Amino acid sequence: MLLGKDVSIVSIENQNKEKETINWLILIVPILVLFFNSLTQSAITSFVSLYAISLGFAGAGMFFSVNAIGMISSRFIMNRLVIHFGEFKMLLLNSLLFFISVYLIGQVTRMYQLLFLALPAGFATGAVAPFVNTFLIKRMPESKNGIANATYYAAMDIGYAIGSVVWGIIAAFSGYRMIFYLGALMQIVGVILCLAQMKIYRLK
């Protein structure tokens, strides 16, 4: 009886350990996508005003108002889109949308073009960050929610911190347009990672 009881206790403990195991292989791609997203977004928040001034545009602050509208609007419809199309597919599509928006920001010649691109850029950024946070919490054991939130904020903060320094150096040597081209390239890396993850784990 004692032996049987000990075996059952060990079995329950093993099951609990399995439940609390974190599968970092499936989590690493959303974390990296968030990092690249923050890296690129730091280029926008830090340098789009200076970029607009260098092009002779007035009222560059309007960019951030339109950008914020895009971010807010994504919160209202992303949940329905994720349910309909799938988590990773929407992560992929928003990374692609952010790539197109940021690349075209590097091509603008008129202020209205910059304002037009602020909306999809804001939508993509506003969609990716909450998705990754929710994904991490859902995929980690309930007892590890603290790790999920810490990982989320670490990826975001590191992206912004590195971006602010790196983009400043690039701007000094290559100009503002190059910042946005390279920022867009970061999103292509995210797209490739999403495609690989979807294929390996057959995710939607």
Question: Where in this protein do the model-derived segments appear?
Answer:
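C-terminal membrane-cytosol helix-exit motif in multi-pass small-molecule transporters
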Residues: M1-I12, L193-M198
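Structural signature of the two symmetry-related core transmembrane helices
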Residues: K89-L104, A184
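Paired small-residue
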Residues: S101, Y112-P120
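Loop-to-transmembrane helix entry/capping segments in MFS-fold secondary transporters
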Residues: E142-Y152
